[in-house]
Amino acid sequence: MNLPEYISKDEVKRICKELGLRDWSKLKEASVTEKEAAEILQIVNTKGMDIPVEDFKQGLEVELEHGTRYDDANVTNNHPILTGKIVLAHLKETMDYYKRLEVVEIEGDILKAVLAKDLKKVESKYKELVQAQQLLAKAIKEQLPE
């Protein structure tokens, strides 16, 4: 089955220009500036959720995987508003969504390294895992009542 391009690169270019952002259709790395994240957050956060810009920025960088990063999984063509809405939906589920995801992704990386018998990578990823778990534990603690 031949699927259409749902969001064109021209549309991504148009919206980026309108918002004063760099052209996200040309992004090679999933890297978003704090200024870009703040601009997009202001547009998509219509219900006024208390979302730290840094958390939203992390979400944007993760959710760009729904764009041009994987051509066979491209849904958004890196459209900044659609990507922002994906982030918003996940943060509505739980505000620590991306901290939890970071832990899971590192655990997956550790398994890959174990299967590849790459002990150096296992060690470095395990150190990353400890840091990610600490950040998640802190986020959970902050959500709990005193």
Regions found by a protein language model. Give the residues of each.
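Short acidic DE-rich linear segments
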Residues: 143-146
